[in-house]
């Protein structure tokens, strides 16, 4: 998968097209990611220990990984991902600038 938890991404399609956010969680088996502030849905929650009031909550729902691209650290634009081997480790690089995406 071309995005990981903590990556800054831009949404390419769907109702939240153009929005940017951070990947909160990645689900590689389902090819989906949870992006902060994107694809908000309303969840009707019963009263519980954590939420004694209950009611309607706004939470993020996962979106398909093909609808997001990482943001280039140099230019701030969405970029495709390439891979290089440095010091025996495979790292992700931004195709637009050649900058490393992995910290």
UniProtKB/Swiss-Prot annotation:
Part of the 50S ribosomal subunit. This is Large ribosomal subunit protein uL24. SUPFAM superfamilies: Translation proteins SH3-like domain. Belongs to the universal ribosomal protein uL24 family. InterPro entries: KOW (IPR005824), Rib_uL2_dom2 (IPR014722), Ribosomal_uL24 (IPR003256), Ribosomal_uL24_CS (IPR005825), Ribosomal_uL24_KOW (IPR041988), Translation_prot_SH3-like_sf (IPR008991). GO terms for cellular component: ribonucleoprotein complex; ribosome. GO terms for molecular function: rRNA binding; structural constituent of ribosome. Pfam families: KOW, ribosomal_L24. The keyword Transcription does not apply. Disulfide bonds: none annotated. Keywords: Ribonucleoprotein, Ribosomal protein, RNA-binding, rRNA-binding. One of two assembly initiator proteins, it binds directly to the 5'-end of the 23S rRNA, where it nucleates assembly of the 50S subunit. It comes from the Bacteria.
């Amino acid at each position: 998968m071309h995005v990981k938890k903590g990556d800054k991404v831009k949404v390419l399609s769907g109702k939240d097209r153009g929005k940017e956010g951070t990947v909160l969680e990645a689900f590689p088996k389902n090819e989906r990611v949870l992006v902060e502030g994107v694809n908000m849905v309303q969840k009707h929650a019963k009263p519980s220990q954590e939420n004694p009031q209950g009611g309607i909550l706004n939470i993020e729902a996962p979106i398909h990984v093909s609808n997001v691209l990482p943001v280039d650290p140099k230019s701030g634009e969405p970029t495709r991902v390439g891979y290089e081997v440095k010091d025996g480790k495979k790292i992700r690089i931004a195709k637009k600038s050649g900058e490393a995406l992995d910290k």
